[in-house]
Regions:
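Non-catalytic cap/lid and distal C-terminal segments of serine-dependent acyl enzymes
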Residues: 1-163
Length: 163
């Protein structure tokens, strides 16, 4: 994060180590996944693509095209400034999921399983289709599901059961 607490580092480096030390959890990637919806879906894919050896990931109604999200006023009342500062274009950076996915594949890095789900009435639906098509064209191990529904918790809870 540009400002505030560094939640990404906490999730990326500290939380899994802590949990594996206090609970009988597997350290294997195939036994661990991280899931989130909306910006949390973005974060789950970013964590998995930044640390492909650690997690599989599920993204429910996720912000998969961070540039679209920054350039359009798609979510009233939400400010990405604490996360990205004054950035208006994150293409080709470690914040861009398209870039991270392609970089990993180009480098021959073994990627985790990715699960992507979205409602067909979600305002992020077209972006999710764009990411799905991009990932599948790169032969990424991506499973995509869609269901009728909007960008709300009712759909998120329904889709979470399938993860």
């Amino acid at each position: 994060m540009k400002y505030g607490h560094d939640y990404f580092t906490f999730m990326q480096k500290e939380l899994k180590i802590f949990l594996c030390n206090i609970l009988p959890l597997s350290n294997k990637r195939e036994d661990n996944f991280i899931a989130g919806h909306s910006m949390g879906g973005y974060g789950s894919f970013k964590l998995a693509l930044t640390n492909p050896e650690l997690y599989a990931a599920a993204c429910i109604s996720g912000v998969v095209d961070i540039n679209y999200f920054l350039q359009k006023d798609v979510q009233k009342g939400f400010s990405a400034k604490p996360i990205f500062g004054d950035a208006t274009n994150l293409s080709g950076t470690d914040h861009d999921l398209f870039y991270l996915l392609k970089e990993n594949i180009d480098k021959g890095i073994s990627l985790p399983k990715l699960y992507q789900m979205c409602g067909t009435e979600d305002y992020l639906y077209e972006d999710n289709l764009k990411f799905r098509d991009f990932a599948l064209n790169l032969n990424a191990d991506l499973e995509y599901k869609e269901s009728s529904g909007d960008h709300d918790f009712e759909l998120h809870l329904q889709l979470l059961d399938t993860v």
